Amino acid sequence: MNLQNNKGKFNKEQFCQLEDEQVIEKVHVGDSDALDYLITKYRNFVRAKARSYFLIGADREDIVQEGMIGLYKSIRDFKEDKLTSFKAFAELCITRQIITAIKTATRQKHIPLNSYASLDKPIFDEESDRTLLDVISGAKTLNPEEMIINQEEFDDIEMKMGELLSDLERKVLVLYLDGRSYQEISDELNRHVKSIDNALQRVKRKLEKYLEIREISL
């Protein structure tokens, strides 16, 4: 796609009067201002989509940037003959780019080793073959390429967890799901590493029992 500037470009106010599809036509003939307009217009939309996903150990801005790449691709690839609006097409491309990037990162083992090992550890140590990731995601099986936790799914049980977990357990869980290592959590909460591990084990047991009571299929 040619992104060089053309003479006679519209200003922002004029772009606002056009449909997105019309602005894209200008992008496709080299109007970089039109491209900037669409990127700016959809930036918050990308951030909203990025908030739905997070990867253990990843910086949220990394996911936002992947979403922006997906947005650019949607602008580049959108065709007038598509049987959908640009916004719907953009949402598809943004989501696909984010998920692909997360899967690629896990395949390349970009997540911290300690986070991966801990998340993959059975909830009741050797007494159970279900992991914390299995419980939170509601997945029957979960391989490293699928270590994507949907924030919306976690929010559904967050309120109940607030009732079941102690203050320490809640803090440990939040930091753990944010990708912190045991040592980092220990330093931040000024607790021994063993105390952090014990708290997380209690969280796992409470979480599993709660979901079983609710008869959620894992």
Curated annotation (Swiss-Prot):
Key word Repeat present: no
Motif Polymerase core binding positions after renumbering to this chain: 62-75
Gene3D superfamilies: 1.20.120.1810, Winged helix-like DNA-binding domain superfamily/Winged helix DNA-binding domain
Keywords in alphabetical order: DNA-binding, Sigma factor, Sporulation, Transcription, Transcription regulation
GO molecular function, one term: DNA binding
Purpose of the protein: Sigma factors are initiation factors that promote the attachment of RNA polymerase (RNAP) to specific initiation sites and are then released. This sigma factor is involved in the transition to post-exponential phase in the beginning of sporulation. It is also required for transcription of several stationary phase genes. Association with the RNAP core increases rapidly in early exponential phase, and reamins constant expression level after.
Name of the featured protein: RNA polymerase sigma-H factor
Species name: Bacillus subtilis (strain 168)
